[in-house]
């Protein structure tokens, strides 16, 4: 095992992965400390899912709810009625990390956390109509020291503060995770109610089609929320979700509620002023077929031939291209890929890629503002569509369709869209899913699509022990 010297925050020291046991990453979620967060790559050592990030005990935090932004450090709580993205600049002043000379490591400490979908009300003039059922913050972002796992090279990097002490940081981290235990036995309630009946959802689709026909918008995502009882800790649910639904970008965030995400979709990446977004529109569910890649490609071709899905994908790519153009150098924005097939465990997606070169005067918070929330989970045009979503969906979306990721000290950012999304809160499990609606959508089919997306998540939490859960559709 490689030794790891205790250094200043400006020094990242590598540790061989064998300094941890196999269950360490599971126990990282079960932390007795405050604000534990885990951003994890599960689908392999590709460039897009190379690193997993573990953070504990923030140096300073910024939280926003409604019109109030709270900046918190170890000594004080400062309330500021301001744009929460601007507040990130203030929380960065609490840290003292200079970027290291390890240029290959993009995240060397910084602000990590999430922005709920509803934070858009602070960024755009959007009416407030939906019921605020979930009371979590609209933004929860903090500065952290961190542990970084490189899947490609099987190396752990530890970033530690100057005052951490004399113990080898690898030993300190190993002592921490080995002190935790994990119990995989828990129950999920037999029935999950929905905030839509099938008739009400179909009526919502019809109303959306009226808006589409009048030219208010060109495509929209309509979501429904499921809720049921659980007897489990949120970290237990996360580990079960990770096993049942592995994805390139997974997240566990302990900020008031337990937020659990398995996302295949990047909303915005900035590496050395190179911008990248990867919208997903088009999904093939079920594990890869026995016929192999050729049969799967045939299924993808069939999907591409569906006019409704083709129209949806083209509109979303155009929306993301416009978002990148707001912060990109003129003439640099390119659609690098459109409708490419990517395979994951249990699902295949049709993915596009839009890139551009960042304008020199643009800061990290400006990038988030330009691309938030992701167009695949709102619709086009974005602001008008969000107003209509607020009118039709019974509750606010909260974290669903928001974003999770980081802004690094060195200036780069990486955020993913929070889909699929589970919340564990006060003995209840909330699950939210939706689907894209266009002019030729069939209301009953749209209801079934969104309902089954939620059911797939809930069933996945039970598959590990072979339990049978009766799912309900409230009529």
From Swiss-Prot:
GO terms for molecular function: 4-amino-4-deoxychorismate synthase activity; magnesium ion binding. Its EC number is 2.6.1.85. Gene3D superfamilies: Anthranilate synthase. Keywords: Folate biosynthesis, Magnesium, Transferase. It catalyses: chorismate + L-glutamine = 4-amino-4-deoxychorismate + L-glutamate. Pfam families: Anth_synt_I_N (PF04715), Chorismate_bind (PF00425). InterPro entries: ADC_synthase, Anth_synth_I-like, Anth_synth_I_N, Chorismate_C. GO terms for biological process: folic acid biosynthetic process; L-tryptophan biosynthetic process; tetrahydrofolate biosynthetic process. Its cofactor is Mg(2+). It comes from the Bacteria. Pathway: Cofactor biosynthesis; tetrahydrofolate biosynthesis; 4-aminobenzoate from chorismate: step 1/2. Monomer. Heterodimer consisting of two non-identical subunits: a glutamine amidotransferase subunit (PabA) and a aminodeoxychorismate synthase subunit (PabB). Belongs to the anthranilate synthase component I family. PANTHER family: AMINOBENZOATE/ANTHRANILATE SYNTHASE (PTHR11236), AMINODEOXYCHORISMATE SYNTHASE COMPONENT 1 (PTHR11236:SF41). The catalytically active amino acid residue K274 of the E.coli enzyme is missing. Part of a heterodimeric complex that catalyzes the two-step biosynthesis of 4-amino-4-deoxychorismate (ADC), a precursor of p-aminobenzoate (PABA) and tetrahydrofolate. In the first step, a glutamine amidotransferase (PabA) generates ammonia as a substrate that, along with chorismate, is used in the second step, catalyzed by aminodeoxychorismate synthase (PabB) to produce ADC. This is Aminodeoxychorismate synthase component 1. The gene is pabB.
């Amino acid at each position: 095992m490689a030794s790891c010297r205790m250094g200043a925050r400006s020094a990242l020291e590598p540790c061989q992965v064998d300094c941890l046991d196999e269950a360490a990453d599971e126990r990282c979620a079960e932390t007795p400390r405050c604000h534990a967060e885990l951003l994890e790559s599960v689908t392999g050592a590709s460039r897009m899912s190379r690193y997993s990030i573990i953070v504990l005990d923030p140096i300073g935090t910024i939280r926003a709810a409604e019109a109030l932004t709270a900046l918190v450090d170890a000594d004080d709580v400062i309330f500021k009625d301001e744009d929460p993205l601007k507040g990130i600049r203030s929380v960065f002043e609490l840290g003292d990390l200079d970027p290291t000379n390890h240029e290959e490591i993009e995240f060397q400490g910084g602000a990590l956390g999430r922005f709920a979908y509803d934070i858009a009300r602070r960024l755009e003039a959007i009416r407030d109509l939906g019921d605020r059922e979930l009371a979590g913050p609209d933004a929860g972002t903090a500065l952290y020291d961190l542990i970084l796992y490189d899947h490609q090279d099987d190396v752990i990097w530890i970033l530690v503060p100057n005052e951490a002490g004399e113990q080898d940081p690898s030993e300190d981290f190993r002592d921490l995770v080995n002190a935790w235990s994990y119990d995989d036995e828990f129950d999920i309630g037999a029935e999950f109610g929905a905030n839509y009946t099938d008739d009400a959802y179909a009526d919502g689709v019809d109303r959306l089609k009226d808006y589409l026909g009048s030219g208010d918008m060109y495509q929209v995502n309509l979501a429904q929320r499921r809720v049921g009882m659980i007897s489990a800790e949120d970290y237990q649910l996360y580990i079960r979700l990770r096993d049942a639904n592995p994805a390139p970008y997974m997240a566990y965030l302990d900020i008031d509620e337990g937020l659990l995400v398995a996302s295949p979709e990047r909303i915005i990446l900035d590496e050395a002023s190179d911008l990248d977004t990867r919208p997903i529109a088009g999904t093939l569910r079920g594990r890869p077929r026995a016929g192999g890649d050729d049969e799967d490609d045939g299924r993808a071709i069939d999907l591409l031939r569906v006019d409704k899905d083709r129209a949806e994908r083209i509109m979303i790519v155009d929306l993301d291209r416009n978002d990148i153009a707001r912060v990109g150098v003129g003439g640099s924005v390119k659609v690098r890929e459109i409708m490419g097939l990517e395979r994951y465990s249990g699902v295949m997606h049709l993915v596009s890629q839009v890139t551009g070169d960042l304008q020199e005067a643009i800061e990290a918070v400006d990038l988030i503002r330009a691309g938030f929330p992701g167009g695949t989970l709102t619709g086009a045009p974005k602001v008008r569509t969000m107003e209509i979503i607020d009118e039709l969906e019974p509750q606010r979306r909260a974290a669903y369709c928001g974003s999770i990721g980081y802004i690094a000290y060195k200036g780069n950012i990486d955020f993913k869209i929070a889909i699929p999304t589970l919340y564990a809160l006060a003995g209840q499990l909330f699950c939210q899913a939706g689907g894209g609606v266009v002019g030729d959508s069939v209301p009953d089919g749209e209801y079934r699509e969104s309902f089954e997306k939620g059911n797939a998540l809930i069933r996945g939490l039970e598959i590990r022990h072979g339990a049978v859960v009766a799912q309900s559709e409230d009529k």
